[in-house]
A protein has these predicted regions:
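Conserved acetyl-CoA-binding loop-helix of GNAT-fold acetyltransferases
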Residues: 113-127
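Active-site rim helix/loop that mediates acceptor-substrate recognition in acyltransferases
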Residues: 42-63
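Hydrophobic alpha-helical core bundles mediating ligand binding, dimerization, or RNAP-core interactions
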Residues: 26-29, 53, 102, 121
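TRNA-binding/sensing appendages of the translation machinery
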Residues: 23
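Conserved beta-hairpin
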Residues: 62-82
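Conserved acyl-donor/pantetheine-binding loop and adjacent beta-alpha core of acyl/acetyltransferases
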Residues: 79-104, 108-112
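Conserved N-terminal entry element of GNAT/NAT acetyltransferase domains
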Residues: 1-19
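Helix-loop element at the rim of GNAT/NAT acetyltransferase active sites that forms part
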Residues: 27-44
């Protein structure tokens, strides 16, 4: 855990999510500050996380998943996908054929309340 007053965007990077990252995803998805907003109706056992994210990691499902790194240490998660690749979501939000979506969360609570979410989104849009 970090003790940072204001994170520096130059230390933010992204790494494709891999199967060996899923225990960390399970930990984060069960943290109250994440679970309240992200996958809150899902069961977050490791088995369920593997079922949910394994097909995305392997390319069977159309979504790009990344760990967000700060000084090369994982601190969050971001994913992007074309809305029309997920019909149940597309029907819910409405879309055009070119619409994309980005979902993210900060897993390391020490980065909360410091503007890190908008920093990581801006950096992602520039770098990835």
């Amino acid at each position: 855990m970090y003790n940072i007053v204001v994170p520096d965007p130059k230390f933010i990077s992204f790494q494709k999510l891999e199967l060996n990252d899923l225990p960390l995803m399970q930990k984060w998805l069960n943290e109250s500050h994440v679970h309240e907003w992200y996958d809150k109706n899902e069961k977050n056992t490791l088995e369920e996380i593997i079922k949910r994210y394994g097909p995305k990691i392997s390319g069977e499902k159309p979504s790009d998943e990344y760990l967000v790194l700060y000084e090369k240490e994982p601190v969050g998660f971001i994913q992007t996908y074309k809305v029309n690749d997920w019909p149940e979501f597309a029907d819910y939000v409405g879309y055009d054929d070119h619409a994309a979506s980005v979902d993210l969360f900060i897993g390391d609570i020490s980065f909360m309340g410091k503007g890190f979410g908008s920093m990581m989104l801006n950096k992602f849009l520039k770098d990835v």
